[in-house]
From Swiss-Prot:
<dbReference type="GO" id="GO:0006351">
    <property type="term" value="P:DNA-templated transcription"/>
</dbReference>
<keyword id="KW-0240">DNA-directed RNA polymerase</keyword>
<feature type="binding site">
    <location>
        <position position="966"/>
    </location>
    <ligand>
        <name>Zn(2+) 2</name>
    </ligand>
</feature>
<dbReference type="GO" id="GO:0003677">
    <property type="term" value="F:DNA binding"/>
</dbReference>
<dbReference type="InterPro" id="IPR007081">
    <property type="entry name" value="RNA_pol_Rpb1_5"/>
</dbReference>
<dbReference type="InterPro" id="IPR007083">
    <property type="entry name" value="RNA_pol_Rpb1_4"/>
</dbReference>
<keyword id="KW-0804">Transcription</keyword>
<feature type="binding site">
    <location>
        <position position="535"/>
    </location>
    <ligand>
        <name>Mg(2+)</name>
    </ligand>
</feature>
<dbReference type="Pfam" id="PF04997">
    <property type="entry name" value="RNA_pol_Rpb1_1"/>
</dbReference>
<dbReference type="InterPro" id="IPR007066">
    <property type="entry name" value="RNA_pol_Rpb1_3"/>
</dbReference>
<dbReference type="InterPro" id="IPR007080">
    <property type="entry name" value="RNA_pol_Rpb1_1"/>
</dbReference>
<dbReference type="GO" id="GO:0008270">
    <property type="term" value="F:zinc ion binding"/>
</dbReference>
<feature type="binding site">
    <location>
        <position position="78"/>
    </location>
    <ligand>
        <name>Zn(2+) 1</name>
    </ligand>
</feature>
<comment type="similarity">
    <text>Belongs to the RNA polymerase beta' chain family.</text>
</comment>
<dbReference type="InterPro" id="IPR006592">
    <property type="entry name" value="RNA_pol_N"/>
</dbReference>
<feature type="binding site">
    <location>
        <position position="539"/>
    </location>
    <ligand>
        <name>Mg(2+)</name>
    </ligand>
</feature>
<feature type="binding site">
    <location>
        <position position="959"/>
    </location>
    <ligand>
        <name>Zn(2+) 2</name>
    </ligand>
</feature>
């Protein structure tokens, strides 16, 4: 089979009939599958062994040849080649069609490629293909022109003859009438007899005249049609056409069905058509020009690739290998088969019937009907349901065609190529393992034994505990003692991967060193739970085994939990102590007044512990302890304490602290500044962040483990419990509420008197009750004692927040109704007091809405992540520095009123972890930091202190790398805290960072109901999607297209904002809804791009009016706004990566002398390259306008057809790609995963993969100490250390011969 490592590009094209025959191993002639008695495949059938290979390895069908020694022999009795049965997965067959059929993708796809090429409407095409009309294929213009006068004379003569015949017949009838009338007169007949005779004669003459006139007019129509006949014309199947064919059939050719299309395509002159269309584009306007451009795209594709358009009509249908459309026997003798077999059988049956009809010379009408049925059968095989009603199987279920096999989540791309399952894996429930180190996990013994079974067996044989594999297997199954010893030895320092679904970001899979544990549950380190989003309420996790040495090395170096302390989304630690640990450390470091031992002094921590053990000292009492070698931060040392230059105390120091704090500081690194504070959640976060910034990962991991152990130890001893008596309702609650009740009654009274509107009443009531709730909450907080256990949990940050406590102990407050409006009547009781029935009922709305929202959010967020990954998957760091001087100017501080610098609140997620693009200069013009400096926490503090307010930083938005981005523009990798490595897949990390917190974003806002409603403003997840899809928002606000003055025109029905530009251009008129809140006033002067009323702005407008940089700012700011409002930190650079991909394409406006087509979407890099080449030749370059594309559209517009096809609209992408003969450069990750190559990221990058290792002189000398090396030495090439040179004697060797 094809080796994926041997090629770097993958091209798709249109297969010709010869190609299909070349792939095939034989023609499938019969619709039979297998013989139901012998269960062997039928000869020449859909499973025939003669075509597709033997069903059993090394065995022909009749059994004459068995065993591998007959390999390659074709049995003369049954015609089957003796080979492996695996060839039934690769060998194809074919069906020779009795009549050509069109490929449904090219005729029925949108747009119809066949329609564009032949300049026909899809409706007309359908008429021809399905035998409802004839198409003129060719006209012999010269012969027609030459014979026209003679033919016309003949026809005129014929018409004259017909006219003469008509006249003579009518005259004859008239004569007869006169004779009859004379006879009647003579007989003395009555007048009504005469009238009858007269009427009868007139009727007869009328019929004669009509018959002759019809013939004459038909001949005239036939002549007119013949004169004006042209290629491509459609003719209905009627008497006129048959007459035309009979009389003038030698001058033209007309056909029906795919045959007509095929003949047109074979005679189609692509070059001439291309020239004609270019001319039309140059001179045409409007719709005509647009259609010409679209047609030229199709024509150019065929011209460029050399594909024959006739390949869109099939004469041969390929039959895929039988193992890919299997047939399996069920219990009870029935068979289950792939739908494809049924579809193939329909094609074969109809094809055979058509062939028989043609051989019998059946009438054309019957043959045409059979051809149409064959066309429909092939259509159903390729894309069932695309045209007309789908072919159904049992239970009215539409059969799955070849297209359905590729499409959607269950299709080949997403199910089997991008979603493979792996062996060497297992899964189990997780439980907490507080005794583990950060890089360890507890693996159940039985599970480990099963996972490492092959390795255990090999080691047992190596150690001679077993003689062969079978014996070793038996030992393992019986769990002998030696097996456990061997298992312990094997798993030592051998990492395993743990994964928890859903894997929303890269921290969802991490490596750990397994520790064997009893039981059946996997033990997980408590600090990594946040990264996995795991808890221990029944969650399950999967274990995977990295097998190769390279995989183990990557797992250990890149994926080990102790190396993944930082979150890739914002570069801050993810392994923070939580819950019990925080309670324990909070208990340890709290300071209490008036407890045992307060004010005592101790010579060491050990002595203080002794006093505590004797119960004479409280853990939290303020005492003085003598400590040695303590470090203090700048300005933090107590008075009188002397420090050296590193901040370390000189000699011992008697420090006023608590025993708990002294113990807590022992968990931190020796040279870490002494912490004299309560370790609550915020403080711990600060400490861990600082540790991660200052120390190597090994030390950070060790410190985190010590902090964790101390947290659990002291949480146990803190005795924190919760009883109902801890829930204290404030005694002042009733008084507070009665005051607000009076205010509410007053507002209600004003409304009832008609002094206020309903909206104003609601608004005022909501404000009153919000104040009441806040006051009750304040009273409740003040009422809770400091040592109250609920208070301790919330104030330490271990669990819960004040809002939850308020609902339990204070009052629930305002809730919303099912419409999302706030009900202006609060729930005045708390859960502790119990709710009334009415209160309970109105609470249920919010609860139910919350659950429904969460379910919707999860699906939406997952789909957003998928689109983000798809659009950014080929953004990989490809080079060190692209050399650009461009960058973004970002603020880091503002000048306060007192002249001091105030740090910008968004610094953490905007400038942090980037590189300077230009020197950072303060107001005095001094360079504070040179260009290229890394901007970390320390640097930011240094810049602000030096009075720098704005810096220019490198950004992926301004990176000029042709493929991917460069390391300098990206800056630090947030996951490691160092400059990003070449090969890092920053696009996927960006997508994960944005998508992972997606579930936390609300679906939509709550409406307060009434005037101040945020009704039309989309927020939360839908807003993020709207921005990334670059959609025009609902109720979008216009922006000023020029600087100028505003005039507002208000009428009863409408409102207009008129902008008169300063430069005297035409005024711009913006119609505005009456209910919109304007941001400008009559007569106000506005600047370019200023927003005119409240609402979101359309990104496409921002791009058109203000340019690329502004639309970048708008998109990044908009997305950040949503995430910040939910308190989710994400670094700007991730959003910038996605925005870079959205602005990747330009639309060609004028093509100049280039090959580009007007209206074509082109990659900016390719556009610049084409223009550069055109310029060097001295020709006219193309012009283009920048596009902002939504992420879905951008994913489908990628250069890689494999990636686009596996994303969405599979059939459309493949149709287009095959027609254009597209070549996939395999630069992204998806396309390489699909074909099974190493991904071009990380260690899979060619830069790292194609490394050749050459030994240094020292290494050689060390390995071969007795040999002298010269450059010609054979050892430079290979290692011949196994050769015993001394055993050669000179007699054995003569030059040029071997004995």
């Amino acid at each position: 089979m094809l080796d994926v490592t041997t090629f770097d590009e993958l091209r798709i094209g249109l297969a010709t009939a010869d190609d299909i025959r070349r792939w095939s191993h034989g023609e499938v002639k019969k619709p039979e599958t297998i013989n139901y008695r012998t269960l062997k495949p039928e000869k020449d059938g859909l499973f025939g062994e003669q075509i597709f290979g033997p069903s059993r390895d090394w065995e022909c069908s009749c059994g004459k040849y068995k065993r591998v020694r007959f390999k390659g022999i074709v049995c003369e009795r049954c015609g089957v080649e003796v080979t492996k049965s695996a060839v039934r997965r690769e060998r194809m067959g074919h069906i020779e069609l009795a009549a050509p059929v069109t490929h449904i993708w090219y005729f029925k796809g949108v747009p119809s490629r066949l329609g564009y090429l032949l300049d026909m409407a899809p409706k007309d095409l359908e008429k021809v293909i399905y035998f409802a009309a004839y198409m003129v294929i060719s006209v012999d213009e010269d012969a027609r022109h030459e014979d026209m006068p003679g033919l016309e004379n003949e026809l005129r003569l014929e018409i004259k003859t017909l006219q003469d015949q008509r006249d003579s017949q009518i005259a004859e009838r008239l004569g007869r009438l006169e004779t009859d009338l004379a006879a009647l007169e003579a007989e003395g007949a009555k007048s009504d007899q005469k009238r009858r005779a007269k009427d009868g004669a007139e009727k007869e003459m009328g019929q004669t005249r009509k018959a002759f006139d019809e013939d004459i007019s038909r001949l005239e129509r036939v002549w007119e049609e013949f004169r004006s006949l042209k290629v491509g014309e459609l003719k209905p199947e009627d008497a006129v056409f048959h007459e035309l064919q009979d009389r003038f059939g030698i001058y033209f050719e007309a056909h029906m069905g795919a045959e007509a299309i095929q003949k047109r395509l074979e005679a189609f002159d692509l070059e001439a058509e291309g020239e004609l269309l270019r001319e039309q584009i140059a001179t045409g306007k409007g719709q005509k020009k647009i259609r010409a451009i679209k047609r030229l795209r199709v024509v150019s594709s065929f011209l460029a690739t050399g594909n024959s358009p006739a390949a869109m009509v099939l004469q041969v249908v390929p039959v895929i290998p039988p193992e890919l459309r299997p047939m399996v026997q069920l219990d009870g003798g029935r068979f289950a088969t792939s739908d494809l077999n049924d579809l193939y059988r329909r094609v074969i049956n109809r094809n055979n019937r058509l062939r028989r009809l043609l051989d019998l010379g059946a009438p054309e009408i019957i043959v045409n009907n059979e051809k149409r049925m064959l066309q429909e059968a092939v259509d159903a095989l390729f894309d069932n349901g695309r045209r007309g009603r789908p072919v159904t199987g049992t239970g009215n279920r539409a059969l799955k065609s070849l297209s359905d096999m590729l499409k959607g989540k269950q299709g080949r791309f997403r199910q089997n190529l991008l979603g493979k399952r792996v062996d060497y894996s297992g899964r189990s429930v997780i439980i907490v393992g507080p005794q583990l180190k950060l890089h360890q996990c507890g693996l159940p013994k039985q599970m480990a034994l099963e996972l490492f079974k092959p390795f255990v067996i090999k080691r047992l044989i190596d150690l001679s505990h077993a003689q062969n594999i079978k014996a070793a297997k038996r030992m393992v199954e019986r769990s002998r003692g030696q097996v456990w010893d061997v298992l312990e030895e094997i798993i030592r320092e051998r990492p395993v991967l743990l994964n928890r679904a859903p894997t929303l970001h890269r921290l969802g899979i991490q490596a750990f060193e397994p520790q064997l544990v009893e039981g059946k549950a996997i033990q997980l380190h408590p600090l990594v739970c946040a990264a996995f989003n795991a808890d221990f309420d029944g969650d399950q996790m999967a274990v995977h085994l990295p097998l190769s040495v390279e995989a183990q090395a990557e797992a250990r170096i890149l994926m080990l939990a102790s190396n993944n302390i930082l979150k890739p989304s914002d570069g801050r630690p993810v392994t923070l102590p939580t819950q019990d640990m925080i309670i324990g450390l909070h208990h340890l470091t709290t300071l209490k007044e008036g407890v045992a031992g307060e004010g005592r002094a101790f010579s060491s921590v050990a002595e203080a512990i002794l006093a505590k053990d004797q119960l004479s000292l409280d853990l939290n009492a303020k005492v003085r302890i003598r400590l040695h070698d303590i470090y203090f931060g700048e300005g933090e040392a107590p008075e009188g304490v002397e420090l050296d230059e590193k901040g370390k105390t000189v000699g011992p120091v008697l420090l006023e602290t608590t025993l708990g704090r002294a113990l807590f500081n022992e968990t931190l690194p020796v040279d870490y500044p002494y912490i004299e504070a309560v370790a609550d959640k915020g403080k711990l976060s600060e400490i861990v962040n600082d540790l991660a910034e200052r120390y190597p990962k090994v030390e950070v991991a060790a410190a985190l483990d010590r902090i964790k152990d101390a947290g659990f130890y002291w949480a146990t001893r803190s005795g924190v419990t919760v009883a109902l008596s801890d829930v204290l309702t404030p005694p002042t609650k009733a008084a507070i509420l009665s005051g607000y009740e009076k205010q509410a009654a007053k507002v209600q009274g004003q409304f009832e008197k008609g002094l206020t509107t309903n909206a104003e009443r609601r608004q005022e009531l909501i404000e009153i009750w919000n104040k009441a709730t806040a006051e009750v909450a304040k009273a409740m907080e003040d009422n809770l004692p400091a040592d109250n256990n609920i208070n301790r949990m919330v104030s330490s940050g271990a669990r819960g927040n004040w809002m939850q406590v308020r609902q339990i102990a204070g009052m629930r407050g305002l809730v919303s109704n099912p419409k999302g409006e706030i009900i202006p009547r609060p729930i005045v009781h708390s859960y502790r007091e119990g709710l009334t029935v009415a209160e309970y009922f109105i609470s249920t709305h919010g609860a139910r809405k919350g659950l429904a929202d969460t379910a919707l959010r999860t699906a939406d967020s997952g789909y957003l992540t998928r689109r983000l990954v798809d659009v950014s998957q080929d953004v990989i760091i490809r080079e060190d520095d692209c050399g650009t001087g461009r960058g973004l100017d970002l603020p880091i501080a503002t000048k306060g009123a007192d002249g001091s610098s105030v740090r910008d609140s968004n610094v953490e997620n905007s400038v942090y972890a980037r590189s300077l693009a230009a020197d950072a200069v303060n107001e005095a013009g001094e360079v504070v930091a040179p260009a290229g400096s890394d901007v970390g926490d320390v640097m930011i503090d240094h810049l602000i202190a030096a009075g720098v307010h704005e810096i220019k930083v490198r950004s992926v938005l301004t990176c000029e790398s042709a493929v991917g981005v460069c390391a300098a523009c990206y800056g630090r990798s947030l996951a490691t805290g160092k400059l990003v490595d070449i090969g890092e897949a920053v696009g996927i990390i960006a997508a994960q960072s944005i998508g992972e917190p997606g579930t936390q974003l609300t679906m939509r806002t709550f409406h307060t109901g009434g005037v101040a409603s945020a009704d039309d403003i989309t927020q939360g997840l839908p807003r993020v999607q709207e921005l990334f899809e670059a959609r025009t928002p609902k109720g979008a606000s216009p922006i000023a297209e020029a600087a100028g003055r505003i005039t507002i025109e208000d009428t009863d029905r409408s409102r207009k904002v008129i902008l008169t530009p300063d430069n005297g251009d035409e005024p711009h008129i913006y119609p505005v809804l009456k209910r919109a809140t304007l941001l400008v006033e009559d007569g106000q002067h506005v600047e370019l791009g200023q927003q005119l009323h409240v609402g979101a702005i359309d990104p496409k407008e921002v791009l058109r009016v203000k340019g690329v940089r502004e639309v970048q700012k708008h998109l990044v700011g908009g997305v950040q706004g949503v995430y910040r409002s939910q308190g989710v930190p994400i670094h700007d650079k991730h959003i910038e990566v996605i925005v870079r991909q959205m602005l990747r394409k330009v639309t060609v406006v004028e093509h100049g002398d280039t090959d580009l087509l007007p209206g074509e979407l082109v990659d900016r890099a390719r556009y610049n390259e084409v223009n550069r080449a055109t310029l060097t030749e001295g020709k006219k370059t193309a012009s283009a306008r920048q596009e902002v594309m939504g992420i879905t559209k951008a994913s489908l517009a990628t250069e890689s057809w494999l990636s686009a096809a596996s994303f969405q609209e599979t059939t459309r992408v493949l149709t287009q790609a095959a027609m254009e003969g597209k070549s996939d450069p395999l630069m992204g990750l998806k396309e390489n995963v699909i074909i099974g190559k190493l991904i071009p990221a990380g260690t899979g990058l060619a830069k790292y993969r194609d490394v050749t290792v050459t030994a240094t002189e020292e290494a050689k000398a060390e390995r071969y100490p007795n040999r002298i090396f010269t450059d010609e030495s054979v050892f430079n090439e290979s290692d011949l250390s196994f050769v015993d040179f001394d055993s050669f004697s000179s007699d054995d060797y003569t030059p040029g011969t071997y004995n």
